[in-house]
Design a protein with these regions (language model features):
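Long, non-globular segments of proteins
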Residues: 1-220
């Protein structure tokens, strides 16, 4: 109230404006840049993954979306916290011959940034033993991948260290990086095999031997 008993409307409006000024801005909607998202989901309904390899839309530029080395997806530097949405985006991933990764729908292709791998392998299923062993991995986006000739493993030596980074081909040119704990479990399954006169340490899966490193380098 003012001194003359009237309501101080201007003061109330000032408080509202001040509250609006300090309120955090609404989170950006990561689905906004993708006009063809509904078409992509409709194309795959009841049929598994969308056929992104058969779609050839025009390139519509890059968007501010990134898959971090820790497997977390970001849009405009904010984590995308809705796992179903991340899972949906992951089904639209395609890595082309140019080495770049895109989200692809029937009507658009947009570039995104990938810090390391497209997925993380977060659990491992082991069946059988020896050369009859079969390894399956589940990714952070719920893909299940059996390691075989079509889905090989590769081991990359880290720059400046003697460590190895293990990757699995999930589909197309998309790979999953094993988490450290899963890699330790994988190493426990390793055996030595002679290849072209040299002893290699590696693992078996689906009748294929996947060499990690020369046995001499790891003291075997």
């Amino acid at each position: 109230m003012t001194n003359d008993g009237t309501a101080d409307l201007d003061g109330g409006q000032a408080e509202v404006k001040e509250a609006q000024a300090v309120a955090p801005p609404p989170a950006a909607d990561p689905t906004q840049p993708l006009r063809g998202l509904s078409e992509a989901t409709a194309a795959s309904r009841g049929r598994g993954l969308p056929p992104v390899d058969r779609w050839n839309p025009e390139f519509c530029g890059d968007i501010d979306m990134r898959i971090g080395a820790d497997g977390i997806w970001y849009y405009q530097n904010s984590p995308i916290g809705r796992k179903p949405l991340v899972r949906l985006f992951s089904t639209l991933l395609r890595k082309d011959e140019d080495g770049k990764t895109y989200l692809v729908t029937p009507v658009e292709k947009v570039g995104i940034t990938v810090d390391d791998a497209h997925f993380l392998a977060v659990s491992m299923i082991v069946e059988g033993e020896g050369d009859a062993q079969v390894l399956r991995f589940v990714t952070n986006c719920d893909d299940e991948v059996t390691v075989d000739a079509d889905h090989p493993m590769r081991f990359v030596r880290q720059k400046g260290t003697d460590g190895l980074k293990p990757y699995i081909l999930v589909r197309g040119r998309l790979e999953a990086l094993l988490t450290r704990s899963i890699f330790y479990d994988l190493v426990e399954l390793g055996v030595t095999r002679t290849i072209d006169g040299a002893d290699w340490f590696g693992v078996w899966s689906s009748g294929q031997f996947f060499p990690m490193a020369p046995a001499a380098e790891i003291g075997l």
